[in-house]
Amino acid sequence: MTIEHTQDLAQIRAMVPEMRRVKSIHFIGIGGAGMSGIAEVLLNEGYQITGSDIAQNPVTERLVSKGATVYVGHQASNVADASVVVVSTAINEENPEIIAAREARTPIVRRAEMLAELMRFRHGIAVAGTHGKTTTTALVTQIYSEAGLDPTFVNGGLVKSAGTNARLGSSRILIAEADESDASFLHLQPMVSIVTNIEADHMDTYGGDFETLKQTFIDFLHNLPFYGQAVMCVDDPVVRELIPQVSRQVITYGFSEDADIRIENYVQEGQQGKFTVVREGKANLDITLNIPGRHNALNASAAIAVATEDDISDEAILKAMAGTEGTGRRFDHLGEYETGKGVAMLVDDYGHHPTEVDVTIQAARSGWTDKRLVMIFQPHRYSRTRDLYDDFANVLEQVDVLILLDVYSAGEKPIAGADGRSLSRTIRGRGKIDPIFVADINALPSALANVIQGGDLVLTQGAGDVGRVAKQLESLQLDINKMQNA
């Protein structure tokens, strides 16, 4: 450990006390974005970090390079020296490491509980909502970094400008994505909370009851202190409905006329969105946002609302918006490729809910009006496909060419009629487009080779392993030479 790092740790310890009697922290499922981010922050705070996952990936390799120990596979001996065990929601209670920790009476906490501990002595800014959390978290982080405030951040995806999804900063500010999928965001006690939107998702957590989901968001906002701030998107009808029930200071944002932070005159020019932000009692801001789509203008205005309330300079806000590189797998422009039939543009996107897919399609249509849109879509979870089946069909039939993969299960058991083949048949039966169903993802490159044309915008879409299609394109030699990004 360098002298500089020792001095930095001493400065951090003056703000954030050590967790007593905790030396070694073990993460089960350390390769996930949320888990790895917390692990990296704690590693940089001086804790010994170990973890396990079913395979190594770039995230775990990064942690190992920084001094963590990562085991491939789960076994009881991995937790033998752990002071505390952190588990992700994807881990089954019968996991041998959980059983061993329980037998040893080692504390077992969920990811959000450990995030709450990181936030406890800091000025926390939490970003919640069904869609847009990761990008909004990155944009808030970018503004605060541009202002020289050096925040700690923990995001659910790669902050491309930082080259990581988490970083330990030297200030008291912690910016974090808040996960509602298992209601664990109720552990967090931030000073500022953003709610981007609320839709029916992860409904198994909420007993299939949308009213329970809405009440959970209200409870989350009431974790704010009486002097805290709730930043809420007034364009979203469910969020608008909840505002009168929130007994904290509320700042609204959106395109709506009654928004406190209002977006006007939005236009998209290729990869960039340009618009004006109108703020009561403050100068208007003419924003150039280096990521496309009206949905990202909303994400940006949420970040601007928080920064404005914190008296961050307009110069820092404008520079952060123009300079943002976005987040990994969120309309991620991977380049242009020679197909043998002309040049095609490749974009990768993580969106896996119908609303997310829809706004991605609209961004592609708005920015590249002359291109044929070829979507490769991989449904994520059988339960989501079942619950939102008609919504998926309505959204997916908007593209010009649709290649459908089977469902990425994420550990779920198959549900009859909620699979890729069934969805393909339903869309075909509507008569608008004729989907191509590919049962084996390894057969995808050859299926794409049969339909791709010069001038296409090829969009790989979904939260599963569809993102590795770009690598397969190279192996198929659809792109012999990757061209310079446009």
Curated annotation (Swiss-Prot):
Pfam families: Mur_ligase, Mur_ligase_C, Mur_ligase_M. Pathway: Cell wall biogenesis; peptidoglycan biosynthesis. Gene3D superfamilies: Mur ligase, C-terminal domain, Mur-like, catalytic domain, NAD(P)-binding Rossmann-like Domain. It is an enzyme of class 6 (ligase). InterPro entries: Mur-like_cat_sf, Mur_ligase_C, Mur_ligase_C_dom_sf, Mur_ligase_cen, Mur_ligase_N, MurCDEF_pg_biosynth, UDP-N-AcMur_Ala_ligase_MurC. GO terms for biological process: cell division; cell wall organization; peptidoglycan biosynthetic process; regulation of cell shape. ATP binds at G129, T130, H131, G132, K133, T134, T135. GO terms for cellular component: cytoplasm. GO terms for molecular function: ATP binding; UDP-N-acetylmuramate-L-alanine ligase activity. It is found in: Cytoplasm. It catalyses: UDP-N-acetyl-alpha-D-muramate + L-alanine + ATP = UDP-N-acetyl-alpha-D-muramoyl-L-alanine + ADP + phosphate + H(+). SUPFAM superfamilies: MurCD N-terminal domain, MurD-like peptide ligases, catalytic domain, MurD-like peptide ligases, peptide-binding domain. Its EC number is 6.3.2.8. Keywords: ATP-binding, Cell cycle, Cell division, Cell shape, Cell wall biogenesis/degradation, Cytoplasm, Ligase, Nucleotide-binding, Peptidoglycan synthesis. NCBIfam families: murC (TIGR01082). Belongs to the MurCDEF family. Cell wall formation. This is UDP-N-acetylmuramate--L-alanine ligase.
